[in-house]
């Protein structure tokens, strides 16, 4: 039989038909997997690790998939952008991160527990939107003025939330999931309530999860590239960049870096066992991954901190957490300048503690209520005349003829300028600390008293912390770190974070100690005046300019300290053990009979948790059977399921389990990065369930797809039923009560009206109120007090608040509470306004006596009013 001639037209038609067939197969029945290749070795078979070129082709996005991606994009855009203008007031941590964006625009320095990138991005978006920093984001429920582009600022995290959705789909495709399953799983992420909520407000979670999702996608793309090709290096570099962005947004990004690191080790182990890979290539893998995956994130992290310091170049409330050397580089600082370097007998100095931010060695005309009941010695954070001490010889008077420098090993006395008493220690129990190795320090003496041996202190220079050279022999202002050893007891002048009670005005306790952290006995001289030293011989110095690395190190010490201090109870905090089961939510906003409450989509949430538990059980059973001699399956579907699901479960564990060892306040939103890994793992369970496990029967596969579809519908129903808590839209009490199966879901149904019609009445009432003309007063923008440490109580000689410097630091526990998430207001009540810290705590020690007099006057007035009331009552009778 003669063959029909093949014409060019028939070739084109056949090619087009093949393309059409391939595209249809790609979308609906495409198998993105290939069989793993095993080769025989001398002792056992080994896995060939180099990906086949066909894998990249099978898992690339095909033409018809763009329609699927477009639909996901539109749905995600609508879900996350819907009604962003509501609420039109501050929600939850917008208090902090909106306030931080404001400070980037104003350039005022602040301190936060998170790296700067996400906050800088919000600041940049605000600046692009025309925000001038005239709104403070002071309290939850504060209404945004027209001048604040809060909708524009909220659009940024919403867009990143949309981007996370697209990355989820692409990641699942790169890890071997069919398009239809990737579509369904991504749809679950779109309608996951907690992810929708956090992507609608000025919060760090949406940027963080987006960067983590980008790192996961880039890594999965990297895994299927042929080693040392352009695509391989490009994907590896993209992974490093995404890791750097995540790490620079929140320290949770460290867990993502650890995840990639573990997978690198895991893959290198198989590379070593692959006999087809040369030793040279193994070293190439090691160095390429190490340099790019560590070097790029570190470079980005430091670079963003450099930009952070450049932008925040003005003195602000955050300076109170930093050292004087750091603050000296900020514009508008009041750190002492032009200091005489040479310190000697007769110098009037201020002595600053090194390793706490308690401030200066200080005394005042107030006395301990325990122990010796002598004059108090404290650390005080303000510049103040009560910080000044005269350096005296221990055994005589000061000779005004010649300057005697202060040197290592010299015995001296320190005389308090304002009260004339000397720094003193003895065998008395400290006022607060109860350790037996600490003794009381006081100020002791009186007119005409020459002092005693308990006033004697020996100067010991700490060479390794002092500037090299003369500062290691002679005590130099700023440049010499020293200890003061009590000559009689051998104890060292010591201070920690312990605070004195109210009678000590909350100032930091100073004791002498024979043990404890050595660094807590380190001091330096900040200001120095000496009339004996000829002006021509005086060397004038200032704080040296800190390098970027020094600023980064100091900032991280403060960030870590503040983070560790977030230990006080918060009403909406929760335990990590509660997160996988979604036992607790967070009240974000509550006003005008509406509420925003962070709650996950329980259907998706519990399914992700179940998939994690199921995979863990499956691994244990498989390993047990393998030990009994059952070989591991090399079926391509099972093999890919094992490898990919293991990587996602590992990511879930690394982003979840570390929270169990953290002592700080924790909240449900801390679980969201782990949840993202759980959803990716859930997608692979859908894949194995609708594919391999039901592949023997088309009917069973159809049933499997129906079950997955019903699961998606159930998740959608949950999203719709609880959407009022996402968007802060009207709801009724009755509808709300039907949605509370657990006591931990403690959103307040009493917030809502009984009927939806009441909201229309409320809207009309609010609209009529807004039409009433009001005078707008433009005031100078203030620094948000939410990040400010409270002022320590000030001494009675200060005449006005303006005379006091901003406090360096309050007790860590109290300071960091200012950085903790605020409580959402209930109903229409406003959160109490924070008093101006420059006014609230002024002159507390002198006000104690005044407060007693005022109290007595109030009591007398109340008694007089009571008498008058009784008289009136008798007349009426």
Swiss-Prot record:
The chain crosses the membrane at residues 109-129, 150-170, 196-216, 226-246, 252-272, 291-311, 604-624, 643-663, 666-686, 700-720. Glycans are attached at residues 83, 195, 395, 400, 721. Residues 340-394, 403-462, 472-528 form the MIR domain. Signal peptide: none annotated. It comes from the Eukaryota. It is an enzyme of class 2 (transferase). It catalyses: a di-trans,poly-cis-dolichyl beta-D-mannosyl phosphate + L-seryl-[protein] = 3-O-(alpha-D-mannosyl)-L-seryl-[protein] + a di-trans,poly-cis-dolichyl phosphate + H(+); a di-trans,poly-cis-dolichyl beta-D-mannosyl phosphate + L-threonyl-[protein] = 3-O-(alpha-D-mannosyl)-L-threonyl-[protein] + a di-trans,poly-cis-dolichyl phosphate + H(+). GO terms for biological process: biological process involved in interaction with host; cell-substrate adhesion; cellular response to starvation; filamentous growth; filamentous growth of a population of unicellular organisms in response to starvation; fungal-type cell wall organization; negative regulation of proteolysis; protein O-linked glycosylation. PMT1 and PMT2 form a functional heterodimer. This is Dolichyl-phosphate-mannose--protein mannosyltransferase 1. The gene is PMT1.
